[in-house]
Curated annotation (Swiss-Prot):
Region (Disordered): 1-38
Subcellular location: Nucleus
A GO term for molecular function: transcription coregulator activity
Protein name listed in UniProt: Mediator of RNA polymerase II transcription subunit 7
Polar residues bias (residue ranges): 22-32
Family: Belongs to the Mediator complex subunit 7 family.
A GO CC term attached to the entry: mediator complex
Record's subunit section: Component of the Mediator complex. Interacts with mdt-10 and mdt-21. Interacts with RNA polymerase II.
Pfam families: Med7
Gene name in the database record: let-49
Gene Ontology biological process terms in this record: embryo development ending in birth or egg hatching; regulation of transcription by RNA polymerase II; reproductive process
Length: 251
């Protein structure tokens, strides 16, 4: 920033024209604003003049070229006629070049071919607007098809989502099946028919084993209790003895 100059805001858009200052809200309301400027009907683009009142495609007569087709609306028939005329003129030119290359008819046939090709090109350009409309129509049809496919996909996703939600609601509202009975090997049992309230039970096999062992099991239990008995805090030996005692009882 230069010294003595403050920050200046530069707009990326050009300033409005000077006559815009004459169109204030007050002048527009009281009718004192001048009439708007007339639109340009003639302009130049790359040195070529254009007039808005003229046709989009100027006729050949304006360019000083003979118009060989009569009805431009029946363009297929006229294009076939011009094509045949071009072929005949070309054969005539070849024959002249073979027999008499310096004959004056050679220049005439070349001019005829030039005129025929200009007419064919001009007739094609006459249907550029028709081609543009058809291109827009085809583009819109494709866009409609794409939108229809997208709508179908959305409907399918919505239907699948509703099915999933309905299934979940049915599972919540429906009555849950009764829990299965636990096996005897798990050593658990149900309390009041509730699955999450389990109580450990002593298996019947352990009871039978204890009854069969009899006095031997009682002696072993008494010996372990004697080793683990001590006044005061238990030592490491007695803690190990108690652990062995618990393990033996579980077996």
């Amino acid at each position: 920033m230069l010294p003595g100059f403050g920050a200046q805001t530069v707009s990326p858009f050009p300033n409005p024209p000077e006559y815009a200052s004459a169109y204030t809200s007050d002048r527009i309301n009281n009718g004192s604003a001048p009439p708007p400027p007339h639109p340009l009907t003639e302009f130049k683009v790359y040195g070529e003049e254009y007039r808005l009142e003229d046709d989009v495609i100027a006729p050949l007569k304006n360019a000083g070229v003979a118009e060989l087709y009569k009805n431009k609306n029946n363009w297929k028939t006229e294009m076939k006629k011009l094509n045949r005329s071009a072929i005949v003129a070309f054969f005539d030119l070849v024959e002249i070049l073979i027999r008499a290359p310096d004959h004056p008819m050679r220049e005439e046939k070349m001019v005829d071919l030039h005129t025929i090709f200009i007419n064919m090109h001009h007739l094609i350009n006459e249907f550029r607007p028709v081609q543009a409309r058809d291109s827009v129509r085809i583009l819109q049809e494709r866009q409609i098809e794409e939108l229809s496919d997208i709508c179908k996909d959305f409907k399918k996703y919505l239907r699948d989502g509703r099915e999933v939600v309905d299934d979940q609601f049915q599972m919540i509202r429906g009555k849950l099946p009764a829990p299965p009975q636990p096996s005897e090997l798990t050593r658990v049992k149900l309390q009041d028919g509730v699955l999450h309230m389990l109580q450990e039970t002593e298996a019947s096999d352990d009871v039978e084993m204890k009854e069969e062992e009899g006095s031997e099991y009682s002696k072993k239990k008494a010996r372990l209790e004697l080793l683990s008995r001590e006044d005061g805090p238990p030592s490491v030996v007695h803690l190990l003895a108690r652990q062995f005692h618990d393990i033996s009882l579980k077996k």
